[in-house]
Amino acid sequence: DFGAWFDSRYGQQFTGRKGSDIRTDLYVTVEEAFFGARKDIYVGMGKIEFEVAPGLSNGSTHRVTGRGQKGSTPELNGDLIVKISYLRHHQFEVRGVDFHTTMKISLPTAAIGGSEYVQVLEEKIKIKIKPGTQPDTTLRVQGKGMMTRVGLRGDLYIKIRVEIPTSLSSIERDFFEKMQAGLT
C-alpha cells in the first residue's frame, strides 16, 4: 500500500487529497417546501435524490456528506452543499414563515362588512370583514402561514384592496348621490 510505504519512507502519515465541496441551488415550489418532496439533483455524471423535508426555509443550506468532488479515497470525498430557493408563488409572497397576500373586496362589503374566502395551499379560509374596513387594512390570520421544521406555522397577512366601481347603474348612482348628500 502506497500510504504505508510513504509513512515508512518519510516518517509521517499520508493523508491523501480531500475532494472539493460542490455548491448548488435547489429551486422548490412553496407547496414542496410546505408538504415536503423528493427532488433529483444532477451533479457531474450522477443523480442524487434530495429529501425536501416539510418546513425547509427559503435560503437555508444543507450538507450532503461525501457527494461532492471525489477525494483520493471515498472517505475524503467533498460534500454537496444544497441551498434551498423558493420559486415565486402566484397567490402570495413568503416572508420568513409568514404568507402575505392581497384580497379585493367590494365597496359595499368594506362599508357594511361580510366575509370572503382565500385559498391557502391546502385549505379555503373564511375571512371576516368588519364593517368600515378601510383600504390597505392588513388582516392577520394566526397559524395559516408556512410550516416550520418543528411543525409550527407562521401567520397569513392579508392586505385589503377595496374595489371602487368604474361604472354604475342608475340605481347605484342614485344611492351614492343620496349617501353623499347625507354626509354633507
Short names for language-model regions:
Residues 47, 51-184:
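Intrinsically disordered, low-complexity linker/assembly segments
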Residues 1-42, 72-75, 183-184:
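Post-J-domain flank of DnaJ/Hsp40 co-chaperones
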